Amino acid sequence: MQCFKFIKVMMFLFNLLIFLCGAALLAVGIWVSVDGTSFLKVFGSLSSSAMQFVNVGYFLIAAGAVLFILGFLGCYGAHSENKCVLMMFFSILLIIFIAEIAGAVVALVYTTLAEQFLTLLVVPAIEKDYGYQTDFTQVWNTTMEELHCCGFNNYTDFNASRFVKENKVFPPPCCANPGNHTVEPCTEEKAKSMKVQGCFKEILHRIRANAVTVGGVAVGVAALELAAMVVSMYLYCNLK
């Protein structure tokens, strides 16, 4: 009986933390969606890479909403000893766990396919908005300067852009030499000779270089999810 009470309290506290984290992510997501410029000023290049490939605001709102609901179900289920709510909590967590495993497998096996898919989304945005939408341009400039890369794939992503057509030059990072000193004006010939790597490949390279850390975080998250599922099922099975 004492063990049951202890696990019940731990379940409540653990899910209270998830609930608060979800609320925080929701708040940040709404902030980013409403005022992305100030978010970028506060977090700088820390957030710029991610903002190239996902709409950070909507992503945070979605993740925050899931955590918020999950935390609420866990807290309410443990506190009220409601078997139906505990089963809902377990089911949602199981679906998330399976989706994460599937996503990891797809990311590992179909990296090239993911690159092609993202190219179809990102390159047209570069061609249309770079140099004309302030937030978009600032994010890309920060990313290219911090990661020492050019475009999504390489400098050719800018060939059909309004920016190059009207200014006849490429962004300075596309002409950076190994010492990261830019050669200006950055013409197509100079950009071609410099062979600056695309930002997608650079991000992949950095992720692989930190594979142990990334893997450790993934294993830690998976372990927490498994523990939460085991605890919720234990409470479910021991409730009358």
Swiss-Prot record:
Gene3D superfamilies: Tetraspanin. The chain crosses the membrane at residues 12-32, 53-73, 89-109, 211-231. It comes from the Eukaryota. It is a multi-pass membrane protein. Pfam families: Tetraspanin. Its main location: membrane. Glycans are attached at residue 154. It is found in: Lysosome membrane. Structural component of specialized membrane microdomains known as tetraspanin-enriched microdomains (TERMs), which act as platforms for receptor clustering and signaling. Participates thereby in diverse biological functions such as cell signal transduction, adhesion, migration and protein trafficking. Regulates neuronal differentiation in response to NGF by facilitating NGF-mediated activation of NTRK1/TRKA receptor tyrosine kinase and subsequent downstream signaling pathways. Plays a role in the inhibition of TNFalpha-induced apoptosis. Interacts with SLC19A2. Interacts with NTRK1/TRKA. This is Tetraspanin-1. The gene is Tspan1.
